[in-house]
Amino acid sequence: MGSSDYSTVGRSAGLMTILTIVSRVTGFIRTWAMAAAIGMSLLSSSYQVANNLPNMLYELVMGGMLVTAFLPVYMGVRREQGREASNEYVGNLLGILLLVLGGISLLGTVFAPGFIWTQSFLSGDGGSMDTAAFMFRFFAIQILFYGLGSVFSGVLNAHRDYFWSTFAPVLNNVIVIASFMGFAPVSAQFGERAGIILIAAGTTLGVFVQMACQIPALGKHGVHPHIHIDFKDPALRQTIALGIPTLLATVCMFVSTSITNAAALVVQPETGPSVIAYARLWYTLPYALIAASLSTALYTELSHDAQEKDYDSVRTGISRGVAQMLFFLIPFALYLIVFARPLNMIYCAGKFDESGVALVSEFLIYLALSLPLYGVVVLMQKSFSALLDMKPYSRYCLYSAIGQAGSVLLFGVVLGFVCRRLRDLGRLLAVVAASSPAWSSGQIYPAWRVLWPFARWPGCCRRRRRHVGA
């Protein structure tokens, strides 16, 4: 696969940024179509909860492990044992994903109400999420699609082929847009339940296409995996060893997100999760355009240099990545804070009114404070993964999740009950967002203290090297 070349990071990030712009444009059209079709309502919240849950479950079970462990292990196997061995590793991983994630998808389809309860347990009204449970029966299979797509993207990224993994969401968005555009006429002619089935089936079809469109590109790089299951594969054991600490971080994320969704339903009944979802579209835009592209391209080079024990290059890559992340994301965060309301006026169509715009804008103002820190935290995660040591990162995620969940419950839910008569629920909901910057920053300093000496002082490098090889 060649030696690392940090000069290609900017070029690769540029390609991904262009494709991400196209993806985000279609993503905005998708969100606008959703806002026009179902507005900010109980149906909208049900859709958001049910649609986010498959990705959360995939991340909880396998996602964090695959994202952090697959690429460096795959690159190591291909370099040391050749193409055939790396193909066997990929085939083994795909076989295990089909077994594990396929089983979880089946459980989600059968026991959908129980899965949805994990996101609404504080609301006390289980019947309000019946529609979410119905849609989740369609969405559960997405858990498997996300897992397979992650492996395909990881293989392509390892070969510095970023086109299809970045362009695939565009196809997903186009299909979902068509589903939402058809919601109103289908509901008018056949009833609302038929319209719900349309958007549920269309959303799942979009995720399937996002996964499947990457398969043809694998052959161009000589990747022809034979799907099988071998739990004794040394590469699989290395993947699990590296991924287990990541599992703790993923559990923390799942718990904190579940508490946030449940608290949102308490603080802002029926529409709380919708407020979060609409605000996060703007919040994730600069991250997707700049930070995600930069960290993805940088991750490949960091993994290669870590495999070669070239810690000076690792140091250079991490330092440059942090500087670029802050340089781009701080101005974007200020922009979101200043122009929150004008930006969210784009939603004001169909069933989405100005009161909804005000709620989403207030939430976005507080949430935007964490944007630069969020980008750096993601880069820290990529750096620890490239160095094959996720234990420190997982520990910091645990501390952060405890603090954030405590803040949400104390200031969002408890204060929400105390101040219920004031009807200032929008400001209380913003407290949920305000907790994110504080606890994100709590991850960065200790993580940086670990990463910086790793590349700076030779003695520490030797100590870390022994730890990684253990």
Model-derived regions, located:
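Membrane-embedded alpha-helical bundles of multi-pass transporters/translocases
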Residues: 1-470
